[in-house]
UniProtKB/Swiss-Prot annotation:
UniProt keyword annotation of Cytoplasm present: yes
Listed name of the protein: Ribosome maturation factor RimP
Family: Belongs to the RimP family.
Annotated compartments: Cytoplasm
Principal location: cytoplasm
Protein role: Required for maturation of 30S ribosomal subunits.
Record keywords, A-Z: Cytoplasm, Ribosome biogenesis
Annotated signal peptide: none
Amino acid sequence: MIKCFDKNNEVYNLIKNLTERLNIEILEVNIFRNKNGGKIQIVLYSKDFSLGIDLLTDLHKMILLILEASLEYSFTLELSTPGIDRRIKSDREFQIFEGKKIKLMLDNEFEEGFILESKSKSFIFKTESKELNVSYSDVKKARLV
């Protein structure tokens, strides 16, 4: 299985022009391969609009055409959105989810707050009572709420 956000990933590179033009972020690409073909799972997100079922259906058709024209193995394609309680998996996702409410674990307990601003090595986390500059390396867990 290839599970990643990797800018060198073949699937990512095949669909990035389409998603960039539509102002949609590729959060994750999971590729499962076996002797009979494979399965490709892609998680998409947009800050500007909701990715509802109708839009995902249209995106599925467009992405499927792009991938079928280029990939030399049979596969099924699954598209999804991050979901309300997505675990934040990378520094890049803190930038993507700027302004969103999260649960953050730094020590051994969760705190709820908002990602105010994402920087190269840290982000500003605002709770009801304080603002913290949090280094990505200090984050034990984080998820959307």
